């Protein structure tokens, strides 16, 4: 039987999302979701939303949500692009700012969707090795000959570049676009790089509502950059679908931004739990990277990471294991509630002892 698939569809290796098994009630620490529900503002607004309006298309420009983001960050709405999750925006970046066959630079250990997009859009990826401690050497990113993607904090390591380090990369690539993927920036100890977009026209900063604003199920993200870059993203978007953001997502995004105190409180809870968990795991002999995200990246000399992942799964806890040779002795653990992380640590203790 003829397959009807294109060569690309037959050959590409797609992104592998975190597993979501249904066979038992797992403690889910594998997909970097928030352990806390969305803001009560979001719940109230969705319940009270006009059901009849769902017969109407949403605003293709997402103007009301843009206004909220612009006010929060003290920027112009013309400098904002909103997408159906930051992953969609990242995909649009690969299409808007690169031609087929172009080089594209990013770390050899980072968000694996970058490699998928490079393959999908026929770009030549150049993976720059991290240092032995998994940190980025910014000197490796100076005076390159094409665009750069940097996740900050990086994934799955959780390690962070400072704003000064990022600015040095941007300054030394004036003819290349630099895209900073800030999916986890709200859990870090530094400000977002968005302020640098006012100084540098080659910088685009991408963020998401999925992590720190507890809206992974809504699929909402945004980018900040100069009007030329934003227009490029719009050109790609409107060539696919004018209405990528649905009415309920817009409502949820607006209310999540309005409730800034809830946002701060839940982020601080995650940070506090993360730091407490780091200490406990170090006491158990784990190598714990200094993650500034809502997850930690850990290994132990006495147990192979895949075995630890499988034993935790058997005990009802899901974590993320990567088969890549460079990181196959580490697991990534999403930060849950204090109660969930206490259970995680107790299960870890049992596994190590036995």
Curated annotation (Swiss-Prot):
| EC number(s) recorded for this UniProt protein | 2.6.1.9
* PROSITE patterns in alphabetical order: AA_TRANSFER_CLASS_2
Q: Does the keyword Transferase apply?
A: yes
Q: Catalyses which reaction? A: L-histidinol phosphate + 2-oxoglutarate = 3-(imidazol-4-yl)-2-oxopropyl phosphate + L-glutamate
The record, for NCBIfam families, names: hisC
What is known about its subunit structure?
Homodimer.
This chain belongs to which protein, by name?
Answer: Histidinol-phosphate aminotransferase
Which organism does this sequence originate in? Answer: Brachyspira hyodysenteriae (strain ATCC 49526 / WA1)
């Amino acid at each position: 039987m003829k397959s009807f698939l294109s060569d690309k569809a037959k050959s590409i290796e797609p992104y592998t999302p975190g597993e979501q098994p249904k066979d038992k009630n797992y403690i889910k620490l594998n997909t970097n979701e928030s352990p806390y529900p969305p803001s009560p503002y979001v719940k109230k607004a969705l319940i009270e939303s006009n059901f009849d309006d769902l017969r109407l298309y949403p605003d293709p420009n997402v103007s009301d949500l843009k206004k909220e983001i612009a006010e929060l960050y003290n920027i112009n709405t013309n400098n904002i692009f909103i997408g159906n999750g930051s992953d969609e925006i990242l995909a649009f970046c690969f299409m808007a700012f690169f031609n087929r066959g172009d080089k594209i630079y990013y770390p050899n250990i980072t968000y694996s969707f970058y490699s998928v997009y490079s393959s999908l859009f026929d770009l030549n990826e150049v993976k720059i090795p991290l240092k032995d401690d998994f940190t980025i050497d910014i000197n490796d990113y100076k005076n390159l000959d094409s665009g750069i993607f940097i996740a900050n904090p990086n994934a799955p390591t959780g390690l962070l570049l400072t704003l000064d380090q990022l600015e040095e990369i941007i300054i030394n690539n004036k003819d290349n676009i630099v895209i900073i993927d800030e999916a986890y920036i709200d859990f870090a100890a530094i400000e977002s790089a968005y302020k640098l977009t006012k100084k540098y026209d080659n910088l685009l900063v991408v963020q998401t509502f999925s992590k720190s604003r507890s809206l992974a199920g809504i699929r909402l993200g945004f980018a900040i950059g100069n009007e030329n870059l934003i227009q490029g993203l719009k050109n790609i978007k409107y060539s696919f679908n004018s209405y990528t953001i649905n009415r309920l997502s817009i409502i949820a995004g607006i209310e999540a931004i309005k409730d800034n105190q809830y946002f701060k409180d839940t982020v601080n809870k995650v940070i506090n739990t993360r730091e407490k968990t780091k200490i406990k795991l170090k006491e158990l002999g784990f190598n714990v990277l200094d993650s500034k995200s809502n997850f930690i990246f850990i290994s132990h000399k006495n147990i192979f990471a895949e075995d630890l992942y499988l034993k935790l799964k058997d005990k009802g806890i899901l974590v993320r294991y990567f088969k890549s040779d460079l990181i196959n002795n580490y697991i990534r653990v999403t930060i849950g509630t204090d109660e969930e992380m206490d259970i995680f640590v107790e299960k870890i203790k049992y596994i190590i002892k036995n």
